[in-house]
Amino acid sequence: MVSQLRNHIIQISLGLGILGVSGSAATLCVNPSGTGGCSATIGVAVTAAAPNNTVTVAKGTYHEDVVITKPLSLLGAGSQNTVIDATGLSNGVNIDGHNHPGLSHVSVSGFTVQNANFEGILLTDSSFITIDNNHVTGNNKSLSFPGGVPTCPGLPSYFVTFQGLDCGEGIHLSGVDHSTVANNLVENNAGGILVSDDTGSSHDNLISANTVQNNPFDCGITIASHLIMFGPQRPLRGIYHNTIVGNISSANGLTTGEGAGIGLFAAAPGAQNWGNVVVGNTATGNALPGVAMHSHSPLQNLNDNLIAGNQISGNGPDGDPGTTVPTGIDVFADEAAGAAPITGTVITQNIFKGEGIDLAVATSGGITVRFNSFFDYVGIVNLGTGAVDATLNWWKCSGGPSANGCSTVAGLGVRTTPWLTNPF
């Protein structure tokens, strides 16, 4: 299974590297004064553009909700100079495949996108989209807490049920495939980056080299299946084959205590969130664990996910599996509520420091944990009944788990022999 996931990383990287479309294309321009043959607003230029055109935007501040419905490139003059201020508006940028089926090959680069009521940048039901080198900040302004209950007045109905704590986060991909979100700074929104299946399956996307920080109400990066399906699971549905690589996720969810660094969640009955890769990220100082995997309802599939090569430090506890001290990674299936066991999870080559518990497991499905470096007092706690293959790990010292000065193991069913005598 690990080799298949490695092949998946190669395939998605190759596929996402070729996002252009052939054919001649014109360039339209925008500047605040509308001089020199340019439009004064981004929306006018985007509407006038033919498919595959480029719209270049000069430095300045533009009070707009930019809706994109055709293939094009939207290029700002750098995020420090080019601002889409969506104060009082739904979104800063809306790549609207939900109302324009088949939308593909859109790129948005070089903007600050701020102050939207909901998502700063929203992508729905579209393919081969690139969102890169943007600063997405201060969005989700509609989030309110009347009577202490979170709500997002005006959020489209296909999002309302599940977006109570974040109003869609800074960047939201729903029903999106073969797309890239890379090199963005996403901060001070309710939540950071969200990949969901509210409007359709999201798969084969690359979330890479983003800095996601100080989003106070929710996770840094959330991969969440909201699919509701009470019958037998069907293949190629939900959230699958997404790669989360090389991101920094820090200090998220601190206001509510509800934010993991990176979260893989199955929220509703029948939700499917499988075959994803979380590799080479840094998760530090978040309110919940650095990486959290939660399955809560019957008929869910949160299987065959790979968590590899991440740097995990100084994150928070998680009440769902019952950890009360800072926790690095947790894998939790609420089997008492009818959730299916989580199977096929591989956790490998991660480095844990500054946690109370490095890895907490609470599922009967079994898990493979190898080639990790545990540097804290409790390396692994098994809170479930499944077997944990924890061979070939480093336990803080060469003596192995529970030796004097080494990390420890708690719970039954954790196999640790042989172990590494040096850090991986």
Model-found features: residue ranges?
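Bacterial N-terminal signal peptides that target proteins for export
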Residues: 2-13
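Extracellular beta-strand-rich solenoid/capping regions of secreted or surface-exposed proteins
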Residues: 43, 47-50, 62-75, 83-129, ...
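Extracellular beta-strand solenoid repeats
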Residues: 56, 67, 73-75, 83-85, ...
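Extracellular beta-strand/beta-solenoid scaffold signature
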Residues: 85-99, 115-123, 145-175, 187-202, ...
